[in-house]
Amino acid sequence: MSISYFMKKIVILGSTGSIGTSTLSVITHNPDKYQVFALVGGRNVELMFQQCLTFQPSFAALDDDVAAKMLAEKLKAHQSQTTVLAGQQAICELAAHPEADMVMAAIVGAAGLLPTLSAVKAGKRVLLANKEALVTCGQLFIDAVRESQAQLLPVDSEHNAIFQSLPPEAQRQIGFCPLSELGISKIVLTGSGGPFRYTPLEQFEQITPAQAVAHPNWSMGKKISVDSATMMNKGLEYIEARWLFNASAEEMEVIIHPQSIIHSMVRYIDGSVIAQMGNPDMRTPIAETMAYPSRTVAGVEPLDFYQLNGLTFIEPDYQRYPCLKLAIDAFSAGQYATTAMNAANEIAVASFLDNKIKFTDIARLNQLVVSKLQPQKIHCIEDVLEVDKKARELSQSIILSFSHP
């Protein structure tokens, strides 16, 4: 039997999150193709417990020690054979485990950074859903991919759409493909514009967390939903796209597409535009990366063209979306700026969801942190973590000076 028919063993970093649960959904549609080798989460014991009973992984790991002990006890009571581990070191070791064929890197935030890098350095097939790996460690990350010859496949719907719209030569050179030599003129990132694209600007101060997490098209976690509302999500994706596709500022274009049917596009020098379309369901890009270069069932409804009420495109308004402009400018400023902005944004969004700051304070805080932090060169992961720490501390102190909503 050909090796291509062997079941692929997958490690899911962030299995209890939105991308993780969608990945497990794809696996349930392909039980003969994929085997869950390890599940990794934060502290959601109950969901991890259910996932372990359903998928019977060899390993499960939680970042939180107390949560891991609770999980181990619950699994033992159910005669589960899954070995439970705890802490960052164990998670990094699972990400690089010799038995793993592929690693879904879907831990949200800076917490996913080291495990994702571990998978890359081990030369794994890495299905990249963690934005921070490229936002905070762009050059270091791409250099590690090149050195280890890891296979990097983008899961984010936009980057996956771009990936699918590229020629095979570019797909084989993620991180260092020469766009112009391959006849590519522009990478076009699309975004819905979030739930407030038509809300009057004077009402932005009154936006509540409940309103901000109600995304019109996609089912996402709270943090990413707020990032979509501010378009910081698109800003982070802009930074990622520049690294993933080796694109200059002139080779990038951001367009608001409210229907989220076209997930992104690639312009070619002959005037062609190749777009990837589909229903807004993360299982499509997840399945594409898992099966690449083949295709597999994802459990997604086919796109019904007769139900579409037209496709529209709008130029981004930076007054409405200052976070998008900040991200574009931060890339030009350097790695320290994108790292600081990302850290500040994590604190800002958490504070907004906790009703500690206003919606408009998110962009305000991000801008203040980037402008106040001293520029510095990033040479290694320790430098990244240092900037991240400084930016978080600065963010917390600035928030104290904000008047509460």
Swiss-Prot record:
Binding site for NADPH: T16, G17, S18, I19, G42, R43, N44, N130, E132, G221
List of residues binding Mn(2+): D156, E158, E237
Pfam families: DXP_redisom_C, DXP_reductoisom, DXPR_C
Enzyme Commission number: 1.1.1.267
UniProt-annotated binding residues for 1-deoxy-D-xylulose 5-phosphate: K131, S157, E158, S192, H215, S228, N233, K234, E237
Reactions mediated catalytically: 2-C-methyl-D-erythritol 4-phosphate + NADP(+) = 1-deoxy-D-xylulose 5-phosphate + NADPH + H(+)
Keywords assigned: Isoprene biosynthesis, Manganese, Metal-binding, NADP, Oxidoreductase
Gene3D superfamilies (alphabetical): 1.10.1740.10, NAD(P)-binding Rossmann-like Domain
Gene Ontology biological process: isopentenyl diphosphate biosynthetic process, methylerythritol 4-phosphate pathway involved in terpenoid biosynthetic process
Cofactor: Mg(2+); Mn(2+)
SS bond partners: none
Pathway this chain belongs to: Isoprenoid biosynthesis; isopentenyl diphosphate biosynthesis via DXP pathway; isopentenyl diphosphate from 1-deoxy-D-xylulose 5-phosphate: step 1/6
Gene Ontology MF term list: 1-deoxy-D-xylulose-5-phosphate reductoisomerase activity; manganese ion binding; NADPH binding
Family to which this protein belongs: Belongs to the DXR family.
Cited function: Catalyzes the NADPH-dependent rearrangement and reduction of 1-deoxy-D-xylulose-5-phosphate (DXP) to 2-C-methyl-D-erythritol 4-phosphate (MEP).
Protein name according to UniProt: 1-deoxy-D-xylulose 5-phosphate reductoisomerase
Gene source species: Pasteurella multocida (strain Pm70)
Origin organism lineage: Bacteria, Pseudomonadati, Pseudomonadota, Gammaproteobacteria, Pasteurellales
Gene (UniProt): dxr
